[in-house]
Design a protein with these regions (language model features):
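Small-residue-biased structural context
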Residues: 1-136
Length: 136
């Protein structure tokens, strides 16, 4: 049940990443308002997802009798701090149409970095970390 909730949030994040990609392809100038709306919606989904992991997932896995599970969980927690900073910087820099339009090239570069980082993290969580939920 817990795993399904996290995967549902992952799909929502990936859907928003794809939505932003399409908007960028359609033209930043004409899509800036929609881009900022998508970024702000994604920020909300990510904040809820991270809060749930912090409150439920990580404590569960850190209680595991398996030292490997505890070590991997700690590593994921540390990595999340770095990813959260990358995403927060992106969201703060591009959460309005005017910010996006004032630095279109920077927006595209930052979005590509964020998209890659989020997809990489989601893939790793689903193929490794979430498999430990039933073993914890």
């Amino acid at each position: 049940m817990l795993t399904e909730l996290y995967i549902t949030k992952h799909r929502a994040i990936q859907s928003l990443l794809n939505e932003i990609s399409v908007l960028v392809q359609n033209g930043i100038e004409s899509s800036a308002d929609k881009l900022s709306d998508s970024i702000n919606r994604m920020t909300g989904v990510i904040k809820m997802h991270l809060a749930s992991e912090d409150k439920h997932l990580y404590p569960l896995l850190l209680k595991s009798s398996d030292a490997k599970i505890r070590a991997i969980t700690k590593n994921y927690m540390e990595e999340m701090g770095d990813l959260a900073k990358i995403y927060t910087d992106f969201a703060e820099n591009y959460n309005t149409a005017s910010k996006i339009l004032s630095n279109k090239a920077g927006f595209e570069t930052a979005f590509a970095k964020v998209k890659h980082a989020l997809n990489y993290r989601i893939n790793r969580e689903e193929k490794e970390l979430y498999l430990f939920i039933d073993k914890a």
